[in-house]
Amino acid sequence: MTLQFSWVASANSAETDFPLNNLPYGVFSTDGLEPRCGVAIGDMILDCRAAEEAGLIDLGADPIFDVPFWNEVMEAGHDTWTTLRARLTEILAKGSKDEVIAKDMLVPRAHVDLHMPFLVAEYTDFFASRQHAQNMGAILRGAASLPANWLNIPIGYNGRSSSIVVSGTGIHRPNGQTKAPDAEMPSFGPSKRLDIELEMGAIVGKGSDLGQPITVDQADEMIFGYVLLNDWSAR
């Protein structure tokens, strides 16, 4: 991929995670700003709420960044997502006529607190990696084998959406009942083992109508974006 250059100098560094080609969305606050939507660029964040209020971003008659989450953008659908992405790239590109105004809407990432970027309605964890499934088979059954239905239907687990938190949040060790090999009865207490799995999450943006399935061909237009997840499990 050819690097696109920005007037934000740090976005052109070979070391940055967020060049103009990669503009991740999030929600941030500072000591002087309440939580709001923003987009990272280099070591800065562009305040999307301020950009909309100044007229740099216009996605329709009603404001869309007047709330501290991305759900309204997600609900607007694929065409709006494409328009927004193109406009953000235009604003932040090297030589942009919007630099004079937009530079005052940048906030250093080092000075912000991050918040959940959207309200999570539902969380489904899929057993999608073949290698992971085989490794789990070796742990549980003593041989690297796939579950019988793995190649035919998706294996998924409904998780608790309320347990999803932003990076840096402390993890509470869960309590439950366990039974030691030499014990007659289970005992209640904190989990003695926790493991962590690095996972990729696909964010479903605009939902479907009740009872209407989403085809494979429609899937790309339903996915708003992707995130990295740490999946903690009590063992």
Give, region by region, the residue ranges found by the protein language model:
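Short, mixed charged/polar active-site loops
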Residues: 33-37
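Active-site microenvironments in enzyme catalytic cores
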Residues: 4-30, 40, 46-235
